[in-house]
Amino acid sequence: MAQLPDPQKLLRNFSRCSNWEEKYLYIIELGAGLAPLSDAQRQDGNRVSGCQSQVWIDLASNEQGNVVLHGDSDAAIVKGLIAIVFSLYQGLSVREIVELDVRPFFASLALTQHLTPSRSQGLEAMLRAVRARASALI
C-alpha cells in the first residue's frame, strides 16, 4: 500500500485542486493506492452496511497497540473515501480512534456538499464502522 498522506497534507493537496473534478480525481488516486484485500479480509464480518457500494473494512491492532486498517470497495470514489478515512486514523490507538471526532475535518474538505446523499450516508457508515470496531478492541 502506498503511504497515505497525513491529514494536514491531505487538506493541503485537496485545497490545491482547482475544481471539484480535480478533487474527485485526487480522491480516486488515493483509493488506487490502497493494498488489495485478501479473501479472508473480504468476509461478511468486514462488510460495512449502510453503503450503496460494496465496502469492506478490516481493523486490527498491532503489537504497539496502534490500529492497522485495510479496506476496499467496488466503486473507485468510495475506495478513495476509504483512503481519506484511513489517513485520519492511521497510527492511532483504538482509544484515540474512538475519541477522535473527524467530522470537522470532513467539513473543512466540504465533501458532503459535493457527494450524493447516498455517498454521504456511506461515508458516515464507514466512520461509524471504524469507531465501532475500534471500540470492540478496547
UniProtKB/Swiss-Prot annotation:
It is found in: Cytoplasm. Signal peptide: none annotated. GO terms for biological process: iron-sulfur cluster assembly; sulfur compound metabolic process. The keyword ATP-binding does not apply. The active site is at 51 (cysteine persulfide intermediate). One of its GO terms (cellular component) is cytoplasm. The keyword Ribosomal protein does not apply. It holds the Pfam family SufE. Pathway: Cofactor biosynthesis; iron-sulfur cluster biosynthesis. Keywords: Cytoplasm. Participates in cysteine desulfuration mediated by SufS. Cysteine desulfuration mobilizes sulfur from L-cysteine to yield L-alanine and constitutes an essential step in sulfur metabolism for biosynthesis of a variety of sulfur-containing biomolecules. Functions as a sulfur acceptor for SufS, by mediating the direct transfer of the sulfur atom from the S-sulfanylcysteine of SufS, an intermediate product of cysteine desulfuration process. Belongs to the SufE family. This is Cysteine desulfuration protein SufE. It comes from Dickeya dadantii (strain 3937). The gene is sufE.
